[in-house]
Amino acid sequence: MFVVRKGNPRGIHDWPDLIKENISVITPNPRTSGNGQLSVLAAWGSVVTRGGTETDARSFLTALFRNVAALDSGARGATNTFSVQRLGDVHLTWENEAINEVDANKGELEIVYPPVSIRAEPAVAWVDANLSDPKRAAIARAYLEYLFTDEAQEVAAQHGYRPFKPEILARHSNTLPAIAQFPITAIASSWDDARQKFFSDNGIYETIPRNTDRGTTTFASDRQGR
């Protein structure tokens, strides 16, 4: 999602607005941050899922990172850069992080929901090697089963995560409004394929042209997380 200054003074509503002249974007470094990687994937998908070619998407990604003002190593560092240091016009982040950021900066920030973004689904896994003890396995199974109950889905929604149950999501439409979300399979065959395609040594992110206009070989400074 996009977090912008109160009143959205730069008129940012959709992905193409991020590449306009003099727009300053904050996002974590895709080399070190899952949030940063999602920004890349969402930006790419915003082009190819709306009729653009991969050539168009590469051009868009190049223009986007030309407007990135700083690449913090993690999501929290990027949040601090945008909301505390007040650098940038727009911050790209997870929806739940955006909600927390706006709440923590009452009256100063607001969320913009672009027409389309990527569907990011946090995973939960059962690890056999850690659950050889029957009692521990029973507790783990109970927890996993609980996550899919209405009660747990309601808790998730209250913390800014979209429930997978439509009827529960509908009850939170004021804070989790409708938005078109494309799956990873719209831009790669799987998450593993996406990591290879975009973030390997020869991946798309590593091979898009660098911004030399600022006298540096990278798009923006690689800042350490805070």
Regions found by a protein language model. Name each.
Residues M1-V3, E110, A123-A125:
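Residues embedded in well-ordered beta-strands
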Residues F2, G7-R10, P30-N35, N96-I99, ...:
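Solvent-exposed loop/turn segments at secondary-structure junctions
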Residues G45, T49-P115:
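Ligand-binding pocket segment of bilobal, Venus flytrap-like solute-binding proteins
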Residues R10-H13, G34-L38, A42, D56-A63, ...:
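Extracytoplasmic/secreted proteins, especially bacterial periplasmic and envelope-associated proteins
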Residues R214-R226:
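Acidic, low-complexity segments
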Residues M1-G45:
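A conserved helix-loop-strand patch within extracytoplasmic ligand-binding domains
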Residues G7-N8, K20-I23, A43-T49, R66-A69, ...:
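Sec-exported extracytoplasmic/periplasmic mature domains
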Residues A129-T217:
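Extracellular/periplasmic juxtamembrane helices and adjacent flexible linkers that interface
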